[in-house]
Amino acid sequence: RIIFELLKNSKISDRSLSKKLGVSQPTVTRRRMMLERTSIDNYTLVPKWDQLGYEIFAINFVKIKMEIATGEKDKSVRDRGIKWLMKQPNIIMAGASRGMGMDAFNISLHKSYADYDQWFGAFRSEMGDLVDDIQSVLVNLRGGEVIKPLNFKYISEGAT
């Protein structure tokens, strides 16, 4: 229950959380510290992306060339891909995936379509020799059509 309450509001004090859960403040502090060692990766905020100047939220799907993704080259290709991904500050999540004939995905944020287009061109230029196909879904963060903004509080609402 502590994690779900922290998903709703990670700024809540242990004292307020203890009152909400009906346990002592030292118990909450002890359990939270244990959860921070085992289950909580970090505390993060979810900003209003458009207010920070971001216009595009992109979900990018990648199909790796079959001959590259198998055999001896697999580790070096994977290492090269990971190194490239980690240098991209606008990519907020990436990993392997299954479905739609794609092998990997990444989620990126961009200040404008021109920024996205430049990033996409750099991706094709730097990683294109490893990729068969790239497909992107672009979400306009300023268009007024984001119905349910990204927020982790929804997970806690579904669990309680």
Mark where each language-model region is.
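A compositional/biophysical signature of low hydrophobicity enriched in polar/charged and small residues
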Residues: 1-160
